[in-house]
Amino acid sequence: MTGNLSGENPAESVSTTLAARPEDIALDVAHTAVVVIDMQNAYASPGGYVDLAGFDIAGAAGVIGRIATVLESARTAGMQVVFLQNGWDPDYVEAGGPQSPNWHKSNALKTMRARPELEGKLLARGGWDYALVDGLKPQPGDIQVHKPRYSAFFHSQLDSVLRARGIRNLVFVGIATNVCVESTLRDGFHLEYFCVLLEDATHHLGPEFVQAATVYNVEKFFGWVSTVEDFCASMRAIAKP
């Protein structure tokens, strides 16, 4: 199963089969993108927002390396890579005020209110916290999209950027599995994208069971679940010389 090929000649397409749950899925490389969710200092580096807010980021380092492996395989095969970065303008207008539920629920905003010395430092565009981690820097041909909320499809250019390139299949990696990754994947499903979660290339925020809950939700209701090893194997089968 794969996305709409938009009238393109099937003979010109390059397809591979990805081992996944609940069943394998066929991915046409030209119509598939790896979507990297929020691999920013805020979420994966000591001293970033998530660390300062009291969440355990110990698992993030391993995820960075596995995502780098995924991206190398994807680029070698000619697959599109899209980086998402979560945050707001330096004045936090995009974050919303007290009339927005985001003002009340964002742990970054709550942390800054509790610790005034951090004001203006967390998830502000142009700052260290907002920047992508050193181990995952965009390469020529990669796409970067800003997002102001958990779902990368909300008030962003993501949907139009993907549709303009004929992308119908999305392979998700990043942080946090149970928040921004799942929110974006669910919205992708509702927008008729075929969504795959690479479960060992994601990291959750909170207790271990929330990772398992997201994996269950994706496998049963919203898409397909695979692994870094299986993804890279499928890319090697079609890698450009």
From Swiss-Prot:
Listed GO biological process terms: nitrogen utilization; uracil catabolic process
Catalysed reactions, as listed in the record: (Z)-3-ureidoacrylate + H2O + H(+) = (Z)-3-aminoacrylate + NH4(+) + CO2; (Z)-3-ureidoacrylate + H2O = (Z)-3-aminoacrylate + carbamate + H(+); (Z)-2-methylureidoacrylate + H2O + H(+) = (Z)-2-methylaminoacrylate + NH4(+) + CO2
Active site: 38 (proton acceptor), 147, 180 (nucleophile)
SUPFAM superfamilies in UniProt: Isochorismatase-like hydrolases
GO function term, MF aspect, one: hydrolase activity, acting on carbon-nitrogen (but not peptide) bonds, in linear amides
Family annotation (Pfam families): Isochorismatase
Keywords: Hydrolase
Enzyme Commission number: 3.5.1.110
Family: Belongs to the isochorismatase family. RutB subfamily.
HAMAP family with a match to the protein in the record: RutB
Functional summary from the UniProt entry: Hydrolyzes ureidoacrylate to form aminoacrylate and carbamate. The carbamate hydrolyzes spontaneously, thereby releasing one of the nitrogen atoms of the pyrimidine ring as ammonia and one of its carbon atoms as CO2.
Protein name: Ureidoacrylate amidohydrolase RutB
Organism name: Haliangium ochraceum (strain DSM 14365 / JCM 11303 / SMP-2)
Gene coding for it: rutB
